[in-house]
Every structure is written in C-alpha cells, then in structure tokens.
Amino acid sequence: MSKGPLFVNPGGPGGSGVDMVRLAGDILSKSVDGFYDIVGFDPRGIGASNTIRCFKDGTESKFFMANRNPVLSPGDNPSNHAAWLKAQANQCIAKNKDFLPFVSTAAVARDIDSLRDAFGQELTNYWGFSYGTFLGATYVNMFPDRVGRVILDGVTDPTTFSGELVNWIKTSLIHTEDGIDEFGASCEAAGPEKCALANPDKALAFDGQHYVAPTVRKYLNELITNPLLLSNQSTPGIVVQGEVANAFFLSLYKVANWPKIAAAFAEAIEYSIGDKLHDYLVEAETDRCPLVEDYTMSFIPVLCIDGTHADQPDLKSYMKGLEDASKVAPLAARLWGTAMMQCIYWDVKPAERYTGPWNQATKNKVLLIGATGDPVTPVESAAKLEVLMEGNGVFHKHNGWGHCSLGQPSKCTIKVIRDYFVDGIVPEKGSECAMEDQPFQPTASLQSFGDNGLSYQELSTLADAVHYAQRRV
C-alpha cells in the first residue's frame, strides 16, 4: 500500500525534478521499496514550469552564448565577462520583470505545500539534494506542522545561502581541494591498470610525496596560455583552460567518474589533444533529451533573489571577495564565482524571502545527510543545520567522497535512508556510516545494496540523473 507521494528535488538551484524522475524514477521508487509515489516537479521558472526565457528561442540564445566563453579562465579580463553578464541580466529582467519577484525559494516552498494539499495529504514527504536541502529546510520551517518524512542530502548552509553570495561560495568549497588531493592519492594507490595518470615517469610535478594531484594542478596552470586542440570533432576547435578546469571540477561530484577523467587528462598531457576532455563535458547533454529546451539561465534568478549582495555592490568589491574565496578553493571559487557574478546586476526584489528561524518544532524529525568529502556542500553544513534545528533534525555522517551520499554510495547509508522512509526509523544522534570501497577500486560494484536489492549501477544512474538535472543550470 502506498504511503503517498514523495516529492523530490535534485538541487541546482534550477534543477528539473521532472527530468530527474523521468531518468531515474524507477530507481528512486526501488530505494524506498515501492512504498511511495515518486513525484518530481519543476519549480517556478524552471523547465516545464513557466520557464524564465531571456531570448525568443534556442537559436537566439545560442547566438548570444557564442559571443563568449561561459567559463572565465585565469588571465581573462573580468570586466569583459561582467559586461556580457550585465547585458544578459538586463535582457532577462526586461522580459520577465513581472514574474521574477515570485520565483524565490519561499514561493516554491508554498508550491510544495499546495502539491501536498492537491494530493489530499496531511503531511509532506520530501527528498532534496544539494540546493534542494535549502528548499527543504525552508519548507519544514515555514510549515513545521506538515512535516512527514523529509531527507536533506548534501546540505547547504541555509544561513550563508540566504546571506552574502561570496561568503556562501567560500564556505561551500572548503573541501574541494581535499577532493583533488584524494583523487591523486587514490589514483596512485590504484596503479596504472585502474588509473591512467598513475605513472610517475610521465608526471609533470611532484610535491615530495604525491605526483598525480600536483601534475593536474600544474597542467591546468599551463593550459592558461596553451589551449588544447580538438582532433576528432566534426569541426575544428579548441578547449580552453576554463573548460578543462570545469570538467575536472564536475568529476569531483561522483567518484565513479574519476577513472574517466583521469584517462582524459592522461591523453591531453601526453598528446596535447583535448577530445576526451571535451567529450566528458558534453556527454551528459548528448545522452539525454530534456523535456524542455532551456533557452536561458535557471539558477541565477533563485540564487540572486534568495541571497543578499550588499557587500559586493560592484565588480571591484565582488572580485575582491572572490579573491578571498580563491585562497580556500583556488580552482572551484573562480569557476563558481564567475558563473554567479551576474548577481551584481540582478536588481530584483523577491515578494517573499525566508531567512529563518531554522528551529521550528517540526511534527516529525528531519534526516540530514552530509558526506565527509563533498566538494560543494561540506559535511559541516549538515552538522550545523542539526544544531540550528535544535532537536528537530538528526545528522547522519556519510564517510565518502563526491557530492551528496550518491557521490560514493554505501550499503550502510542506503539502509539508513530506506529505514527512515519505509519504517520511520530515525537514526540515533551521532549516526555514521564508514566508507565501503576505495576510489578507482569499487569492491562493491558487483554487489547489491541492502534489502531492496539496489545495484551499484542503479545508484550510479540515480547520481547521474541528479547531477544531470543540476548541470542544466
């Protein structure tokens, strides 16, 4: 017998819950033993839900995008990049000015409650990933008496997300460099048969103990002035440093992707060819067909409206804040920061914005999951939210790399999730699951995960669906 709808959100902000369920709804259902009706929804302004369009059609959008590289590489003039973003912001605001004040997270939380009511349910069951945890935290504190079973997986700090943008970037990326170091160390431990970069004779750098991570960092620096050629594409082209850095950064989200990105770097370093790196970036888009062609940005409106930017009112002060964040995460802060720079010019005030409190007494306890090696939603954020919720949330520590618990799944955490949703078992304070396999050496890859029989491949597919929905932003 169904326990009712389980609403899911992949994050972003701007991720499509519809695409997520379309791609992996069967796996989500299997993870909860089929006891819930899995419901994905596109939040306001996203996907099939009154998409915010800045251009007339996809052709016009692509023509505009062709005028610049979406990723700012070191050495690029930020003023030129900012001018492009300002032009885009002006266009988007002009075309959507009447609707934009109503796309805040608080507005979407009210929509979730309307969905609950439409399904005839007394309580809301919800599973949110990444930014979806901010949406979930907002909902459970706006509607605490309607909280059923709610899991927030890959928690972003709600106090910084709703605060100054650059500070949120800085505090979100505190483990990104740790992930790069682990990528290198585990590659070396796995050896050349499992990791193409595990060859000290071809290393570009050595720090006295390791060579893979130093090689990757040095190579990314060399690409600033030496872009890669594409040799096997239908048309000639190059891959610039910002794109390669972005490909590597995205690989940190899912440990199962590490062998593939290592092979791409090995090819590029040895032959100065960027085809595998280019293919890594475009693979997710060519393998799937979204229900709605997204002609514009989808994450910028929510990101800029939910936060405050008083300390970064202009490009100069924003770049200073980004420079401080880059001391914590030299690679990722620049990638995130230049993508989010548009908030400087996003002059839209939300009709409603929720910034706390975060300690409302919820009808049921919320499960908060944080992965110890998460590159963008640090485990500390889940622990902090547990404190902020003052007994209404329980933090479960998932020892693993990658983004959210799906970045490097374990039988233990899958069982915690299943037991919470299906049997209503809330883990004890201090709940923790150990890492069950090592990067590049997935001993669990041929095993099923828990009583529900989920396979490692199914969980990998689910992670791809979540990350695909996020990457459309």
Annotate each language-model stretch with its function.
Residues 1-243, 301-473:
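Gly/Pro-rich cap/lid or specificity-loop segments adjacent to the active site
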Residues 252-257, 373-376:
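Acidic catalytic loop of the alpha/beta-hydrolase fold
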Residues 260-261, 273, 277:
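Solenoid-repeat scaffolds in large eukaryotic assemblies
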Residues 264-265, 417:
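Generic hydrophobic alpha-helical segments
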Residues 267-272:
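Short edge-strand/loop segments of extracellular domains
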Residues 277, 282-307:
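Long, low-complexity segments enriched in small/aliphatic residues
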